[in-house]
């Protein structure tokens, strides 16, 4: 792998990447839910058993946090000249994520646009698909990233 940064000009529409391996633990599910999403199906085995989840499941927001960690690790490994993100256009939680699941991510660059007002940066739209260890699609998202242009 090159030590050179990946810039806006290096991104190609349609390019894909697969990365990450994040194993969700029961402790993480309970800790995250207790602090940020204390719904009973995230916290109680007994309650979760009476729902369509069937057992304790991770909060969708916890799933997003795990995905974010894998994305940042990938960006750091690829040495992308990233400048953050103005947000998501779409987010879907398709299947529950359970303690013990191992997640991975596949991304695709949808398109990129140079900034008209900030020549030092551009933006790109990407689609992410999140799979568990059984290759079941558990979440999808479309987001916008900001990235530095070469020479700026």
Where in the sequence are the language-model features?
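HotDog/MaoC-like acyl-thioester-processing domains
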Residues: 1-13, 96-152
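Short, charged low-complexity intrinsically disordered segments located at boundaries
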Residues: 59-66, 94-103
């Amino acid at each position: 792998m090159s030590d050179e940064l990946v810039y806006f000009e290096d991104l190609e529409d349609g390019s894909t990447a697969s990365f990450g391996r994040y194993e969700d633990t029961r402790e993480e599910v309970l800790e995250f839910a207790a602090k940020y999403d204390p719904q009973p199906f995230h916290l109680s085995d007994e309650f979760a058993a009476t729902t369509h989840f069937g057992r304790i499941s991770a909060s969708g927001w916890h799933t997003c946090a795990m995905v974010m960690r894998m994305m940042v690790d990938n960006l750091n490994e690829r040495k992308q000249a990233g400048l953050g993100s103005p947000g998501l256009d779409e987010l879907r939680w398709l299947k529950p994520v359970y303690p013990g699941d191992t997640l991975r991510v596949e991304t695709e660059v949808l398109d990129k646009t140079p900034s008209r007002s900030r020549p030092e940066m551009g933006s790109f739209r990407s689609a992410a698909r999140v799979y568990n260890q059984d290759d079941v699609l558990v979440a999808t998202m479309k987001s916008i990233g900001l990235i530095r242009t070469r020479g700026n």
